A protein has these predicted regions:
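Metal-dependent amide/peptide-bond hydrolase catalytic core
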Residues: 59-167
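Acidic/histidine-rich catalytic neighborhood of metal-dependent amide-processing enzymes
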Residues: 1-57
């Protein structure tokens, strides 16, 4: 016989917010003794790990000035500038990959930056007034996501904003 019971708890919707977890945690707190340990099978493919990458999720909104696409020089196309920010994310990730720590236990062994959702524009022939996109940064231990945000803000402030304001 076991001295303490073993409980199996399953949740759902890991990819878009772990919507089932909060109510599950609340129920566990109310109904059973605090667990001595937990096994989480995702995203480790059931391998034992001692650390997990950090996650920073943020929303970026770019505001431009609407113009007809045949008169782009009179507008500030928000989607095009958002694309340059997204390209910065990709270039920064490539830079990280050059210094991958293959012994880190992470796959990949470097911090990743990713844009997973983008919205903007009203028509194909209009320079968009607004573009919004969502990004996540998965940092390896020892790296601070704030450092990436500061680099990105510096790029926006010193490179993109002057170009956008010159029109």
């Amino acid at each position: 016989a076991l001295k303490r019971p073993i409980h199996l708890a399953l949740s759902y919707d890991e990819e878009v917010g772990c919507l089932g977890t909060q109510s599950l945690i609340n129920l566990i707190k109310q109904e059973i003794p605090e667990p001595l340990g937990v096994i989480v099978g995702e995203p480790t493919e059931m391998r034992i790990v001692t650390a997990h990458k950090g996650i920073t999720h943020f929303l970026t909104s770019v505001y431009g000035y609407e113009a007809h696409s045949s008169q782009q020089h009179r507008g500030v196309p928000a989607i095009m500038y958002a694309g340059r920010i997204i390209n910065w994310l990709a270039e920064r990730q490539s830079k990280n990959a050059e210094f991958e720590d293959k012994k880190s236990g992470f796959e990949p062994g470097y911090t990743t930056l990713h844009c997973g959702l983008i919205k903007g524009g009203t028509a194909a022939n209009i320079c968009a007034r607004e573009c919004t996109f969502e990004t996540d940064i998965r940092t390896v231990p020892g790296e601070n996501p704030e450092d990436y945000l500061e680099e990105l803000q510096d790029y926006i402030k010193n490179t993109l904003e002057p170009q956008m304001k010159s029109i």
